From Swiss-Prot:
Chain's gene name: mdh
Top-level taxon in the UniProt lineage: Bacteria
A GO BP entry: tricarboxylic acid cycle
Function noted in UniProt: Catalyzes the reversible oxidation of malate to oxaloacetate.
UniProt entry tagged with the keyword NAD: yes
Entry protein name: Malate dehydrogenase
Amino acid sequence: MSSTTASPVTVAVTGAAGHIGYAALFRIAAGAMLGHTTPVTLRLLELPDAVRAAEGVVMELEDGAFPLLAGTEIYDDPTRAFDGVDVALLIGARPRTKGMERADLLGANAEIFATSGKALNAGASPDVRVLVVGNPANTNALVASAHAPDIPADRFTALTRLDHNRAVAATARHSGVPVTEISRMTIWGNHSPTQYPDIFHAVVGGRSGADYAADTRWLTDDFIPTVARRGTAIIEARGASSAASAANGAIDHIDDWVHGTPDGDWTSVALPSPGAYGVDEGLVCSFPCRSVGGRWEIVEGLDINPFSRARIDASVAELRTERDAVAALGLL
């Protein structure tokens, strides 16, 4: 994925005319995700009643005259959209509406992502990289993978890079250290308010993150809730959910997956647990990860103190509940 003489990389984006898809597509076309020498073909997948909006997005992509954009295609059929695809950003999901119970939301989206999994299984590239952004992202990724038995489970991931970036930014605001000098941050668990942003293993301007965690009031009353509930704060401030920052997190995630994480650093990725850190095998849980040779590897051997253990366990318990709710619907 590094030469302009190579065949274009085919990238499918679901919910492509939505706010996150719109924010992501132009940066992907400009080379921010796969590199500035890698041509891309973009496949925009939308619901039939949103195809017209997707046509408008394609007009804008054409008008950008991006040198790396080899082509754009619009689909309302996931099987056609995912045929031969190399990267799939599964952004489209049903939002929670007034009066909808969480179980109803889980069920509605599980059906959507079961369909996506089947379509990917039918014809995606053998080494496809799948990133689920649509919420509840962890469990949606679990469902999609379950319906794609011919694709290795480790090719399915869910987005916690947005949360990771939020944790880095919150630490930068508190410490006065630039984000470029903050490394080894970790998000554990679910992409939900139960997530656990872990600064204990981070390096902040050459200092141990544990030094900052020693300020327990900041840690428990500011840092953790600010990161975990940042999405809600953004909705309250702008009247709409995170879009540009979510798109940026997705681009960062795929960029690291393709090109590798920086030496001495790691990032946060929700992927199927192999049983690491006591997390049930198969649960799609966020871990500290490095990208090596195009594959994610969980960072092993970190010391988990009792404070962290309790918070990781709480988020994992929520993931179990989500899994069991979807399984009860016959979708796992």
